[in-house]
């Protein structure tokens, strides 16, 4: 499928990861017609590309590229975030949209898959510049989205502030209030738990991994948890780990890693909140590293990721920054440090080489002796799940309580885990005592659900 495409390394990686999983299972033996479905689902239904012209504070005209990849609507309206970052290109958005199809399928909610964004960099921009950019971006995007067509959300570089600016422009142009974006403010249609959802969700997912692998004897209590990133996902994953009795031993950002000095202790909830405050101001964690309260307890390593810089044992790893942030060598280092569970809070957080290392170790070691890897499309589905719950609340013009949303999130993550587990057992036969492959189970479960819907719609035959 890749030979007639332009060079799109990120999308090619995502496609090959799914295709190899399906090939290495018994799915195509049992249902060979699904090979055709894979060819069809790998081509987006629509790709929208446009210019975004806006004025900076000096009165100068600035030009950026805007995109929306409407990948698949078999299960519902296109659903996926908007990313504002200078690295954004069509390959990255196609990879994210492709992953989003199957992630959304795993939630059990009626959502298709899509992704969008721009190569605009919000860092260093004033509020007025960001507002002017968002207005220009939405002026074009509004022609292609709607509550029953395509419902974007936030992603890297797109917080509640940007969602608000874009929602306001959509409302002005279309003269209607509808749930066309998720991640909205709580006072105007947003859902409680939405900012926390991805981070909380990945921890809830790993809870089930720990309980299954230990036969119900273990939990997060006493676990040393290495986390990368320091945005929403990392912050709320860290807070939930601390709440459940675990120790958070690292965070990071694009400039470097902040790791615990020594083998005892943890980030506290107050320290996580301090990091959250500087991130709202778009500052780097390096600025905290020199403060007395942090320098005595933590070590800052410029230009590094945390995985090979942590003293002592690592029980759980949660990559929560960006794609391909765990390499093959770092995967081996995590195993050497005693890591037993790795779940991606970020999308495609591990390179294919790293996934191969994790899966080979799981295949070669029975039960609790192995590292158990969970892919982002399953482990970080909590964010889009609560976006789906926000859509449901908007449609019904109701607001659910924090407890109601959190309860539904926990159930969705439990179902997501059990679905991947049972599907892996059905289509992939491991050696005696070996844990099932969650990457295989999640890929197959998401793919078969979408493929069946597409077949019934006449998209392939």
From Swiss-Prot:
Keywords: NADP, Oxidoreductase
Keyword hit for Oxidoreductase: yes
Any one of the GO BP annotations: glutamate biosynthetic process
Active-site annotation: 115
A Gene Ontology cellular-component term: cytosol
Enzyme Commission numbers on file: 1.4.1.4
Keyword check for Transcription regulation: no
Domain of life: Eukaryota
Pfam families the record matches: ELFV_dehydrog, ELFV_dehydrog_N
Reaction catalysis annotation: L-glutamate + NADP(+) + H2O = 2-oxoglutarate + NH4(+) + NADPH + H(+)
GO molecular function terms attached to this record: glutamate dehydrogenase (NADP+) activity
Subunit comment: Homohexamer.
PANTHER family: NADP-SPECIFIC GLUTAMATE DEHYDROGENASE 1-RELATED
Family membership: Belongs to the Glu/Leu/Phe/Val dehydrogenases family.
Protein known as: NADP-specific glutamate dehydrogenase
